[in-house]
From Swiss-Prot:
It comes from Arabidopsis thaliana. This is Late embryogenesis abundant protein 7. Induction: Induced by abscisic acid (ABA). Induced by drought stress. Its main location: cytoplasm. Residues 12-23, 50-62, 89-113, 142-151 have a biased composition (Basic and acidic residues). Involved in dehydration and freezing tolerance. Protects and stabilizes the enzyme activities of ADP-glucose-pyrophosphorylase (AGPase) and glucose-6-phosphate dehydrogenase (G6PDH) during drought stress and freezing. Prevents aggregation of leaf soluble proteins during drought stress. Does not stabilize liposomes during drying and rehydration.
Length: 169
Protein backbone atom coordinates (compact mmCIF):
# COMPACT_ATOMS: atom_id res chain seq x y z
CA UNK A 1 0.00 0.00 0.00
CA UNK A 2 2.86 2.16 0.27
CA UNK A 3 2.87 2.43 -3.40
CA UNK A 4 -0.70 3.64 -3.43
CA UNK A 5 0.12 6.32 -0.90
CA UNK A 6 3.16 7.27 -2.84
CA UNK A 7 1.10 7.65 -6.01
CA UNK A 8 -1.44 9.71 -4.16
CA UNK A 9 1.29 11.90 -2.76
CA UNK A 10 2.86 12.41 -6.20
CA UNK A 11 -0.53 13.17 -7.72
CA UNK A 12 -1.19 15.77 -5.05
CA UNK A 13 2.25 17.25 -5.54
CA UNK A 14 1.75 17.42 -9.33
CA UNK A 15 -1.65 18.93 -8.83
CA UNK A 16 -0.23 21.58 -6.50
CA UNK A 17 2.55 22.45 -8.96
CA UNK A 18 0.00 22.73 -11.80
CA UNK A 19 -2.19 25.01 -9.71
CA UNK A 20 0.81 27.15 -8.81
CA UNK A 21 1.86 27.46 -12.45
CA UNK A 22 -1.71 28.24 -13.48
CA UNK A 23 -1.89 30.91 -10.79
CA UNK A 24 1.40 32.43 -11.94
CA UNK A 25 0.24 32.39 -15.59
CA UNK A 26 -3.07 33.98 -14.64
CA UNK A 27 -1.26 36.65 -12.65
CA UNK A 28 1.08 37.40 -15.54
CA UNK A 29 -1.85 37.56 -17.97
CA UNK A 30 -3.76 39.82 -15.59
CA UNK A 31 -0.76 42.15 -15.35
CA UNK A 32 -0.39 42.21 -19.14
CA UNK A 33 -4.12 42.80 -19.57
CA UNK A 34 -4.04 45.71 -17.12
CA UNK A 35 -0.99 47.17 -18.88
CA UNK A 36 -2.79 46.90 -22.24
CA UNK A 37 -5.89 48.59 -20.78
CA UNK A 38 -3.77 51.41 -19.37
CA UNK A 39 -1.94 51.87 -22.67
CA UNK A 40 -5.23 51.88 -24.63
CA UNK A 41 -6.72 54.44 -22.27
CA UNK A 42 -3.64 56.69 -22.59
CA UNK A 43 -3.73 56.41 -26.39
CA UNK A 44 -7.45 57.19 -26.52
CA UNK A 45 -7.02 60.18 -24.22
CA UNK A 46 -4.10 61.46 -26.30
CA UNK A 47 -6.09 61.04 -29.53
CA UNK A 48 -9.07 62.82 -27.99
CA UNK A 49 -6.87 65.72 -26.90
CA UNK A 50 -5.26 65.93 -30.36
CA UNK A 51 -8.68 65.87 -32.06
CA UNK A 52 -9.92 68.64 -29.78
CA UNK A 53 -6.85 70.77 -30.54
CA UNK A 54 -7.22 70.16 -34.28
CA UNK A 55 -10.91 71.02 -34.21
CA UNK A 56 -10.24 74.23 -32.26
CA UNK A 57 -7.50 75.20 -34.70
CA UNK A 58 -9.80 74.56 -37.68
CA UNK A 59 -12.57 76.55 -36.01
CA UNK A 60 -10.21 79.49 -35.45
CA UNK A 61 -8.95 79.38 -39.04
CA UNK A 62 -12.48 79.16 -40.42
CA UNK A 63 -13.61 82.09 -38.32
CA UNK A 64 -10.65 84.15 -39.46
CA UNK A 65 -11.23 83.21 -43.13
CA UNK A 66 -14.91 84.11 -42.85
CA UNK A 67 -14.05 87.51 -41.40
CA UNK A 68 -11.52 88.17 -44.19
CA UNK A 69 -14.03 87.07 -46.83
CA UNK A 70 -16.69 89.33 -45.38
CA UNK A 71 -14.34 92.31 -45.45
CA UNK A 72 -13.32 91.60 -49.05
CA UNK A 73 -16.94 91.17 -50.09
CA UNK A 74 -17.79 94.56 -48.63
CA UNK A 75 -14.87 96.16 -50.49
CA UNK A 76 -15.91 94.45 -53.71
CA UNK A 77 -19.51 95.55 -53.22
CA UNK A 78 -18.40 99.14 -52.79
CA UNK A 79 -16.27 99.00 -55.95
CA UNK A 80 -18.98 97.25 -57.95
CA UNK A 81 -21.63 99.73 -56.90
CA UNK A 82 -19.65 102.69 -58.15
CA UNK A 83 -18.76 100.89 -61.40
CA UNK A 84 -22.37 99.92 -62.02
CA UNK A 85 -23.62 103.44 -61.51
CA UNK A 86 -21.05 104.69 -64.03
CA UNK A 87 -21.82 102.08 -66.68
CA UNK A 88 -25.53 101.52 -66.07
CA UNK A 89 -26.68 104.07 -68.61
CA UNK A 90 -24.30 102.72 -71.27
CA UNK A 91 -25.61 99.18 -70.72
CA UNK A 92 -29.19 100.41 -70.92
CA UNK A 93 -28.49 102.14 -74.25
CA UNK A 94 -26.79 99.08 -75.71
CA UNK A 95 -29.70 96.87 -74.68
CA UNK A 96 -32.15 99.29 -76.31
CA UNK A 97 -30.10 99.33 -79.53
CA UNK A 98 -29.91 95.53 -79.57
CA UNK A 99 -33.68 95.24 -79.07
CA UNK A 100 -34.32 97.71 -81.88
CA UNK A 101 -31.98 95.82 -84.23
CA UNK A 102 -33.67 92.52 -83.36
CA UNK A 103 -37.09 94.02 -84.06
CA UNK A 104 -36.00 95.36 -87.45
CA UNK A 105 -34.37 92.07 -88.40
CA UNK A 106 -37.49 90.13 -87.42
CA UNK A 107 -39.73 92.41 -89.50
CA UNK A 108 -37.47 92.03 -92.55
CA UNK A 109 -37.45 88.25 -92.11
CA UNK A 110 -41.24 88.21 -91.75
CA UNK A 111 -41.69 90.13 -95.01
CA UNK A 112 -39.27 87.88 -96.86
CA UNK A 113 -40.86 84.72 -95.47
CA UNK A 114 -44.40 85.79 -96.36
CA UNK A 115 -43.31 86.40 -99.97
CA UNK A 116 -41.67 82.99 -100.22
CA UNK A 117 -44.63 81.23 -98.61
CA UNK A 118 -47.04 82.95 -101.01
CA UNK A 119 -45.02 81.81 -104.01
CA UNK A 120 -44.69 78.31 -102.63
CA UNK A 121 -48.44 78.06 -101.98
CA UNK A 122 -49.23 79.09 -105.55
CA UNK A 123 -46.74 76.57 -106.91
CA UNK A 124 -48.23 73.74 -104.82
CA UNK A 125 -51.72 74.69 -105.99
CA UNK A 126 -50.62 74.63 -109.63
CA UNK A 127 -48.84 71.30 -109.20
CA UNK A 128 -51.98 69.76 -107.64
CA UNK A 129 -54.13 71.02 -110.49
CA UNK A 130 -51.64 69.64 -113.00
CA UNK A 131 -51.62 66.25 -111.26
CA UNK A 132 -55.44 66.20 -111.24
CA UNK A 133 -55.52 66.97 -114.96
CA UNK A 134 -52.96 64.23 -115.66
CA UNK A 135 -55.00 61.65 -113.75
CA UNK A 136 -58.21 62.69 -115.54
CA UNK A 137 -56.45 62.53 -118.89
CA UNK A 138 -55.01 59.09 -118.08
CA UNK A 139 -58.42 57.75 -117.07
CA UNK A 140 -60.07 59.30 -120.11
CA UNK A 141 -62.28 61.61 -118.09
CA UNK A 142 -61.06 64.75 -119.77
CA UNK A 143 -60.51 65.96 -123.27
CA UNK A 144 -59.15 69.35 -124.13
CA UNK A 145 -62.04 70.12 -126.53
CA UNK A 146 -65.00 68.75 -124.59
CA UNK A 147 -64.15 69.95 -121.07
CA UNK A 148 -62.60 73.34 -121.38
CA UNK A 149 -64.03 74.36 -118.03
CA UNK A 150 -61.77 71.81 -116.30
CA UNK A 151 -58.60 72.98 -118.00
CA UNK A 152 -56.42 74.99 -115.69
CA UNK A 153 -56.21 78.61 -116.64
CA UNK A 154 -53.32 79.20 -114.24
CA UNK A 155 -50.10 80.14 -115.93
CA UNK A 156 -47.46 77.49 -115.87
CA UNK A 157 -44.24 78.36 -114.12
CA UNK A 158 -40.84 76.79 -114.02
CA UNK A 159 -38.74 77.03 -110.92
CA UNK A 160 -34.97 76.92 -111.11
CA UNK A 161 -32.89 76.34 -108.02
CA UNK A 162 -29.36 77.62 -107.92
CA UNK A 163 -26.90 76.27 -105.40
CA UNK A 164 -23.62 77.88 -104.60
CA UNK A 165 -20.68 76.16 -103.07
CA UNK A 166 -19.11 78.09 -100.23
CA UNK A 167 -15.44 77.54 -99.84
CA UNK A 168 -14.08 77.99 -96.31
CA UNK A 169 -10.50 78.92 -95.69
Amino acid sequence: MASHQEQSYKAGETRGKAQEKTGEAMGTMGDKTQAAKDKTQETAQSAQQKAHETAQSAKDKTSQAAQTTQERAQESKDKTGSYMSETGEAIKNKAHDAAEYTKETAEAGKEKTSGILGQTGEQVKQMAMGATDAVKHTLGLRTDEGNKEHVSSAPSTTTTTTTRETQRK
